Amino acid sequence: MPRLSRRVLLALASAALLAAATLAAQTGSGNVQGRLIDEHGSPIVGGTVTLQGSTAPQRTGSDAQGHFRFLQVLPGTYSVTAAAPGFAAATREGVLVSVGRLTALEILLRISDVNEELTVSGETPLIDPGRVATGQTFAREQLTEIPTARDVWALVQQVPGIQLDTVNVAGNASATLGGPSFSNRGSGNVAYAIEGATITDSYYGFALNRQNGGTSIFFDYGTFEDVEVVTGGSSLDQQNSGATLNVVTKRGTNTLKGSARFLYASANWQSDNTPESSSANGLQTNSTRFIREYGGELGGPLIADRLWLWAAGARQDISLSPTTFSETEVPVPETATLEPWSAKLNAQISSPNSLALFYQRSDRSQYGTEVGPKRPPETRVNLLVPSDFYKIEDSYVFASDLFATVFGAYQKPRFQSLPVGGLDRDIEYYGDQYHQTYFYKASQQPQWQGNLHVSK
């Protein structure tokens, strides 16, 4: 009897795990689903459907109801070609696949005695009828057109219901965690993910005097393929009750291609709206001295249709003049450097099996920061925040309506706040201000995670 009970408990636990995994939806891919019909609206059975993008083509067939489905499709723009005996082939161009979403299609095949093909160009449906979650997805094309700072925090501010506690003017606060909150419930209810793996670091938010919630990884805006922000109706695997930000980076394709960029903003390009009364007293408001960013990416095939590599790197330098809080105070420049590096290796092991390896290194250095009304320049600190992130993911499509994905990820965030005044001086507090030096903070919190995702 005890042995039977253990078996029953094991079976129930396995079923619970499978059910939870089935509901998981925080991934780095989407699905394509459709139906083949003839001119009378009847389903076409046994048709061949091909999904063609920038990597290896995928093929499937239509069932007794004319339905077809492609699972675990990476974000991007594709063409879908359908063919069946006795019908003219038809191609749907410009099919957009977004992370975490289902793209629905209906393809009409016309009866034909000759070998011909019809190409249809049109907009991909923007509404997923089977999607419960609410939020917004930004595709690569949108990311280049939205007039915001090149910063993920400024991007998520475009989503209704999300607010930031930091004003980011043209990227002058890109080195600062934006502190996004959802529905005015504090920054602790926003979670972060990259390639579907959670990167929320509760200590990092706490160390910056924010509520729990933050991330020590700073993103390279130029590497985004898709950014998904989920604000409601989330799956059970979401680890908070608020919003979730999921970033999917680019990848190598069958075409060797790359890009480079250089961006610069100068203090001479800014206007000054400081009141004359304040200027006459010698007070200075915060301003941007300069913002400089350069970076590049390169990706392509190692083995066509089988193995692809993509890598990117960037550096952003930000220099600010902080606000002065007395007539005699001389503003000390605050500088920051962000250096994110990324690499992704994708492999098509077999037709149903794919493998992805991802690595990102994020180095953030901020010097002379945290000056404020109670923090004169002598209490400035230097922030050093290096972080490494590794992920391996394997996906297998068992049938047109069943696939599984398993991944493991490791994150090693470090945080160090070094007072400019040194560690050998006492912290004094008088006149409603700190003096001489400030507190030293340090943290290192390695994090492991794994996930099994089964969907039908």
Ranges and model annotations:
Residues 95, 207, 270-277, 321-329, ...:
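Outer-membrane beta-barrel translocator domains and adjoining extracellular loop/strand segments
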Residues 2-4, 10-14, 21-141:
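Periplasm-facing N-terminal accessory domains of Gram-negative outer-membrane beta-barrel systems
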Residues 123, 230-232, 261-265, 314-316, ...:
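Outer-membrane beta-barrel pore domains and translocons
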Residues 257, 286-365, 383-405:
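Transmembrane beta-barrel wall of Gram-negative outer-membrane proteins
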Residues 208-213, 228-230, 276-282, 324-329, ...:
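Extracytoplasmic loops and strand-loop junctions of Gram-negative outer membrane beta-barrel proteins
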Residues 68, 180, 243-245, 296, ...:
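Membrane-embedded beta-strands of outer-membrane beta-barrel proteins
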Residues 87-110, 114-253, 270, 278-287, ...:
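Periplasmic N-terminal accessory/gating domains of Gram-negative outer-membrane beta-barrel systems
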